[in-house]
Amino acid sequence: MIVNGGMDDMAVNYIASKYTTVKIGNGGDSTAASQTELDSPVAEKVVTPSVIGSQLIWTAEFTGADIGLQGVSELGIFKTDSDATDDTMLSRVTFTNTGVIANSDTVTFTMRLEVNA
């Protein structure tokens, strides 16, 4: 029998080690459980999340040059396998569009996820 603590540990550590791609985009539709990609991806970064208890925290910085002139209004966490043709989306959030960011300015996005096995 796998006890609760072991299940929690496996879930948190699996997600932390596999879901390391943060993508931003400029879509704004509601997120559906069947959704597999951002509405309109703009940029992505590889980020290993911090683990605090059962909480995972991804922090990704993007410059205005990364974001482009359209701004961004959605963020997703993805698993990318080297042999996969498509990424697997774990979670997606939408927010008010950032608008244009100066090329040399940096925007920091933080995504927190509570994992309960």
What do the predicted segments below correspond to?
Residues 1-73, 80-117:
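Small cysteine-rich, disulfide-bonded extracellular modules of the LU/uPAR three-finger superfamily
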